[in-house]
């Protein structure tokens, strides 16, 4: 994985891993189990940012963070699918493969640059050809249609583009959470 990724990228206002920022303004969503004390502490300060998960409604909620990319940030729309895959290939060739211990694994078995490639409607054939021609450089690739952020409920990243999105963005108002004040009454750690 390229760093910063996941939650760390939210804290730093950075794009996640090898990916450019999703758009100038977007929603970044993370799943959280309702039983996690740290989530309950967060939700107490920011209930407006949480909702029931459509994928695990019995156990999980989704936290929606409003993200605004820095002015000079590279955005998803600034790269086409092939340009993005070239970056993934470059990092795989120059970082992942040379950084591995060849004696700790089977030959030609490598870690992967975690990636989701956004593909525009006119790019699918070229992307398929590129992946096939360069298959030795990829361990795994997730492909997502260009409008995937609007096609899937509670997508991990969703562009703020409609009036409804703007209203949602304006309603989030994150409040700082002082985690130094968090106390757990019981030890929830399960060692196995």
Protein language model features and the residues they cover:
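Catalytic alpha/beta core of large soluble enzyme barrels
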Residues: 4, 12-192
């Amino acid at each position: 994985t390229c760093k910063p990724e996941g939650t760390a990228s939210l804290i730093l206002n950075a794009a996640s891993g090898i990916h450019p920022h999703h758009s100038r303004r977007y929603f970044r969503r993370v799943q959280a189990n309702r039983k996690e004390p740290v989530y309950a502490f967060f939700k107490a300060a920011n209930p407006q940012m949480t909702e029931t998960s459509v994928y695990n409604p019995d156990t999980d909620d989704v936290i929606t963070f409003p993200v605004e990319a820095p002015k000079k940030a590279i955005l998803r729309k600034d790269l086409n699918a092939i340009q993005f895959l070239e970056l993934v290939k470059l990092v795989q060739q120059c970082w992942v493969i040379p950084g591995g211990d060849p004696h700790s694994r089977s030959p030609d078995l490598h870690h992967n640059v975690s990636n989701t490639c956004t593909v525009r409607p006119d790019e699918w054939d070229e992307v398929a050809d590129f992946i096939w021609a360069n298959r030795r450089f990829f361990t795994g690739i997730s492909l997502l249609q260009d409008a995937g952020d609007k096609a899937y409920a509670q997508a991990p990243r969703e562009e703020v583009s409609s009036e409804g999105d703007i209203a949602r963005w304006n309603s989030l108002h994150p409040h700082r959470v002082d985690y130094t004040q968090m106390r757990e009454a019981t030890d929830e750690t399960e060692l196995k």
